[in-house]
């Protein structure tokens, strides 16, 4: 991790803070924007306590996992439910489940790719170059039990292909970060 750390610290935290500031600016004084972490600080519980103490009673919770998975998004809503069980005067809470094909999300991905192409050159797809969309994998068992994660990852890539005018052979869907001996979603990025 030392090689990816920035002067601001964790890249995830630095990006999350930047997103919070951008959303705060975008919404102006229409809403209070707060950053909460599921596995870190500031914790979801401490942020909800702070919002409550400031008089806020309505919360829109947006987990920053674009594709829903029980192992990610559901843990946020589970933590929220556990928090609400401990309160007598409950907050009114809405959650965003996922946003795999949200136009603004797809546009942000496409612009990031196009910016990279402008800086480093577009791949030579005619010569066999590939663009790989690599998602964190989940155990195959979770998929078999009905977890929609894989289909939402594929939906993201299909929308990105359409936006970038790429074929299935030019923009591939792969999965990474497997561990243990169980079967995981594939194809594996490392084998692609």
How does the language model describe each region?
Residues 1-192:
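Active-site-proximal alpha-helix that buttresses catalytic centers in soluble enzyme cores
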């Amino acid at each position: 991790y030392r090689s990816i750390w920035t002067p601001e610290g964790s890249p995830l935290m630095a990006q999350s803070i930047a997103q919070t500031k951008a959303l705060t600016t975008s919404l102006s004084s229409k809403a209070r924007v707060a950053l909460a972490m599921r596995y870190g600080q500031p914790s979801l519980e401490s942020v909800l306590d702070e919002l409550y103490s400031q008089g806020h009673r309505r919360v829109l919770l947006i987990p920053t996992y674009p594709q829903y998975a029980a192992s990610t998004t559901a843990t946020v809503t589970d933590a929220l439910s556990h928090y609400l069980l401990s309160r007598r005067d409950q907050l009114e809470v809405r959650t965003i489940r996922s946003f795999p094909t949200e136009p603004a999300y797809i546009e942000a991905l496409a612009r990031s790719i196009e910016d990279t192409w402008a800086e480093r050159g577009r791949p030579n797809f005619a010569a066999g170059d590939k663009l790989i969309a690599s998602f964190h994998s989940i155990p195959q068992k979770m998929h078999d039990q009905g977890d929609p994660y894989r289909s939402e990852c594929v939906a993201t890539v299909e929308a990105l292909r359409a936006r970038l005018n790429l074929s299935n052979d030019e923009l591939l869907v792969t999965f990474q970060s497997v561990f243990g001996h169980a079967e995981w979603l594939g194809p594996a990025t490392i084998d692609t």
